[in-house]
Amino acid sequence: MVRIIIALLFCFPAVTFAQTYQQLSERAIECIEKDSLPQAEELLLQALKLEPKNAKNALLFSNLGLVQRRLGEFDKALESYSFALNFAPLAVPILLDRAAIYMEMGKTV
């Protein structure tokens, strides 16, 4: 009986702390709203690793680009926006955000 309880104690934290793609995405949005940008970036990356082929990744990559842009990581932000465009090539807001970064960096396409 003691062995079963000990086994459950070791397994329970893993289940409690495992988060779904949706939960990570929602927590990332909360962090963005609270201006906890490094934490938001980490949560978005975790969600993307969980489901790399999810169709909603265009939004996650776009949000990641926003976070990285606000952190001043322009090269990373460009890469994130480009990945977002792989999922949604005609998304005008993403195209505009990527163009704005090019302008901020003084680059032309």
List each model region and its residues.
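Start-of-helix register in tetratricopeptide repeats
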Residues: 22, 56-59, 93
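Register position in tetratricopeptide repeats
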Residues: 33-34, 67-70, 104-105
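Short coil turns that delineate tetratricopeptide repeat
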Residues: 52-55, 89
